[in-house]
């Protein structure tokens, strides 16, 4: 998409923050309007995260206008809301390539721009990193300022509160901006509150506040009286007591869509000492009515026609693995009132919408709190219930100690339904489910299952749910199932694989949903094909039988080769002194960038053609 100067005359003047700061203040509302329209035009043509960016247009303009970026360091939490930031920092003409193979990264990325101070993708990291950056800036002594922008969802995570607690202790000079888009602008975010925010952030108030502290520091009763008086004045109109108790100077809430008001407040706060907290209220999807009404649906969008106000409906083809899980969950819950389902803020993505409506008293969205989710499940299991933690592979990493310490060591029957395992596509390095087999396989007595299709997925979920000797995990990918018939649910024998095809000389041991591609290769090379099903415990007897009757083995998985299922096969063969050549096919030892799942599998040699080429080259 070429940039239309006539359509966006003010935005055309801004291809860097230096150019932005040359604009007169009175032109900034027009710039915000054009930036919002350009974002709508661009993302509707290319796909991407949408509603969050619409809500942060004014904030982005104000921050870059007031602060001397990139010298001053601006950190975005998660990064869904950072599209306007990318547009204003030299990437305007490339925004149509975002999330595409070889295009702009879906989130702020240090390797892409000097304006991207912190590479992000997972939530709640900004304040911790910001403290470190602020401390480094203080030691540098160049008066460099640090700003963190965090959303109302991300700030619920424990890591954010750990960071704020530390900031209150060491008191670095930094600003945390809370972008609160959970509700529309309420009555208390009006003229009075905006005026109060500017007053409380102004130099006169700050000077009196700090001067008073020094003067009366030796008179404890008066110092305490002044502190309480200030708290009462603020408490009458602002909800910031928690942040004040953590050691921040709280300002807000203010209208996050008043760009000129934001600039005034930010200028007042820029030179304040110690940790500052600015609470702004925004509306997710601002400026595009369908997104304002349904910000969840418009959070991330495919290509769509903005004039229709609707996203394209799915073709009604095969169900996704998330839906397969959600249907199984509802079916099982209807038969067993001990079932409890937990998700860390991933209801829609994990296929749990229907369950949450049908069984609200057994559905727990714990917000962005993966560690709590796992230990909460442990408590439910101790109480005699059957907890299921539905979580993305990349987010389970955040609760690794809880899986080990709170679940596995105690042999608690918690089922982990691990979605988005393997290559996820457009979200890139931070979201690939590349490591779960490796980091779970080393946990004693953990049962790990890798279904090759949707029927096996259901059977494995059923098997894991009824496994009472410890934790179990079923990992399945993002995307649609393959269309096999669903058979009645039954428990699978733990640790047993099945031979799908008998061939000669070469055997392919497949783990997971690359099975259709592996089957094509087996047919082409007349190889034996085994659906291993279990990564732990491995079917050692079957592995040894196959090794004894074949000249070479190939393992296939959509997980990091290092420490993955193939590594487990190698360990079995070495332990039994079976010197059979083994080729491990899986994800390589680097972080996999964005692109469609099909593009990345082809590039990494995980489609049928790539696998066959690797095997032939290895055998040659």
Swiss-Prot record:
EC number: 2.2.1.7
Reactions mediated catalytically: D-glyceraldehyde 3-phosphate + pyruvate + H(+) = 1-deoxy-D-xylulose 5-phosphate + CO2
Entry note: cofactor: Binds 1 Mg(2+) ion per subunit. Binds 1 thiamine pyrophosphate per subunit.
SUPFAM superfamilies (alphabetical): Thiamin diphosphate-binding fold (THDP-binding), TK C-terminal domain-like
Binding site for thiamine diphosphate: 80, 121-123, 153-154, 181, 288, 370
EC category: transferase
Superkingdom of the source species: Bacteria
Pfam families on file: DXP_synthase_N, Transket_pyr, Transketolase_C
Annotated InterPro entries: Dxylulose-5-P_synthase (IPR005477), THDP-binding (IPR029061), Transketo_C/PFOR_II (IPR009014), Transketolase-like_Pyr-bd (IPR005475), Transketolase_BS (IPR020826), Transketolase_C (IPR033248), Transketolase_CS (IPR049557)
Cofactor(s) needed: Mg(2+); thiamine diphosphate
Family annotation (CDD domains): TPP_DXS, TPP_PYR_DXS_TK_like
Known pathway: Metabolic intermediate biosynthesis; 1-deoxy-D-xylulose 5-phosphate biosynthesis; 1-deoxy-D-xylulose 5-phosphate from D-glyceraldehyde 3-phosphate and pyruvate: step 1/1
Residues that hold Mg(2+) according to the record: 152, 181
Cross-referenced PROSITE patterns: TRANSKETOLASE_1 (PS00801), TRANSKETOLASE_2 (PS00802)
Molecular function terms, GO-annotated: 1-deoxy-D-xylulose-5-phosphate synthase activity; magnesium ion binding; thiamine pyrophosphate binding
Function: Catalyzes the acyloin condensation reaction between C atoms 2 and 3 of pyruvate and glyceraldehyde 3-phosphate to yield 1-deoxy-D-xylulose-5-phosphate (DXP).
Subunit-structure text: Homodimer.
NCBIfam families registered for this protein in UniProt: dxs, PRK05444.2-2
Official protein name in the record: 1-deoxy-D-xylulose-5-phosphate synthase
